[in-house]
Amino acid sequence: MIFFIILRTIQTFRTHQLHPFTESAENKSIMMTQIEKYANSRNKKEKERALCWLTTFGIQSVVSLKPSEDFLDIIKRHIEGRCDIQQIHLDTREYYHQVHHRSHSGELAHHEEADKVSVRIMELLEQHECGLSAENFSKTHRHMFHGIYHDSGKLRERPASKKEWVLSNSSVLYPSSDLIGDYLDRLFSIERAINYSQLSSSHRLHSYSSFIARLFMINAFHYANTRTAFVYAMQYMLSRGYQFKNDTFYREAWYFRNAMIRACYTNMHQGIYPTTEYMVMFLGNLFHDEDNELRNHRMVIKGE
């Protein structure tokens, strides 16, 4: 049964004034507001599922992807426990199979990636398991983007560089493509050897932050490295018993991306070295319900 009844007119995205992922209250859809209300539900399971969906939408927001209104309508059934994630997966796939007969617009392609990848991210987050290996990291990328990017799960084969707002248009120094496999194997080997039971709560967050940042810094794939690192990181921490306490990722995903970049960046001429302090503040809010003030402008490095 197809639960998407009609394809609603999708609201035009406005140009954000503060940064690409800021959304004003007046621009937020009524449907999204309803999803947010579930995150404050007294029903524990509803709240957990809603926070997972909001985290998923936060992850997608780093590339300005927003779910369609029809998709937001259908996931309410999952949040309320009336169907499982596999049913959402099937309905979404069938929905886009049907609407492709009527439209091939760029807006449709935008929402198709937003909706399909969101379902796949949710599938991964619900597993609450995460194999620490380069192979499983590649599988995460493949699961998220198969049928969307032709080289999903395939390691990068060319140089990588990207101007970053938080670095005043400088780039993190990414490893050459021929070293990616070795870097991943070494990183996972080191992480598997860490005995987290011997660390304090604060030191655990610092250790997780260091691992996540280094994973991001390898820039393993041709596309979607940020989203893949985000999803894998959340899979990993959920598998270790952490739980989302709030919608920090939904509201502050861009902050976390900037924090990862700062944890990877070195400029000895300016006296700038990698720091995980911003990542730890974010994770403290997300998993420990702390109240750290997350300000993007505090991370900005002035150009030379």
State each model region's role.
Residues I2-E304:
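FIC/Doc superfamily catalytic core
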